[in-house]
Amino acid sequence: MNDFTLNAELRSDLGKGASRRLRRLAALVPAVVYGGDKAPESISMLAKEVAKLLENEAAYSHVIELNVGGTKQNVIIKALQRHPAKGHVMHADFVRVVAGQKLTAIVPVHFINEAAPVKKGGEISHVVAEIEVSCLPKDLPEFIEVDLANAEIGTIVHLSDIKAPKGVEFVALAHGDDKAVANVHAPRVAPEATEEGAAE
């Protein structure tokens, strides 16, 4: 049984006005499901069920069982549109998962052993919070682990420094973009402190 499930209903009343009415009057989130060998479907889901699902970070990078009017299909979250001030989900895009067919997904990054470079006097800057990956559905990781145990002051951790899980490829690297993920730098000194030190 899939731990990540959502119930939805097909909707025929489309357009921005219809979506606003769904959110305002029925506390529903409009969404679209596409991909695979089926036509796109416009659906709606209870806002409270969507919010509850997203309380678990793993839902963003996990195969979700979507029950649309009694028909179940496996999907992943492709995009979420949130309210700019309140943060709740206003619209969602889902992509169907096809067994044996590679998919791309956004996976959160987990940094571990951050205390090691801090003990050496360094400060850590996280450059990214998530990484786009390509893999088969069965290989989709819940997160990508970045180990900073051996990082020194001046270290820049790039995608190529991270060991990808078996069967997983970093999309940016495949396109020649070895982007920075994190860096360790010396503590920044306030201008006032620098001037006082020079005066002494």
Curated annotation (Swiss-Prot):
What Gene Ontology molecular function terms does this protein carry?
5S rRNA binding; structural constituent of ribosome
Q: List UniProt keywords, sorted A-Z.
A: Ribonucleoprotein, Ribosomal protein, RNA-binding, rRNA-binding
* An example Gene Ontology biological process: translation
* TM region(s), chain numbering: none
A Pfam family per the record: Ribosomal_L25p
Summarizing the function annotation, the protein's role is: This is one of the proteins that binds to the 5S RNA in the ribosome where it forms part of the central protuberance.
UniProt-recorded name of the protein = Large ribosomal subunit protein bL25
Task: Name the species this protein comes from.
Answer: Pseudomonas fluorescens (strain Pf0-1)
Instruction: Please spell out the taxonomic lineage of the organism that makes this protein.
Output: Bacteria, Pseudomonadati, Pseudomonadota, Gammaproteobacteria, Pseudomonadales
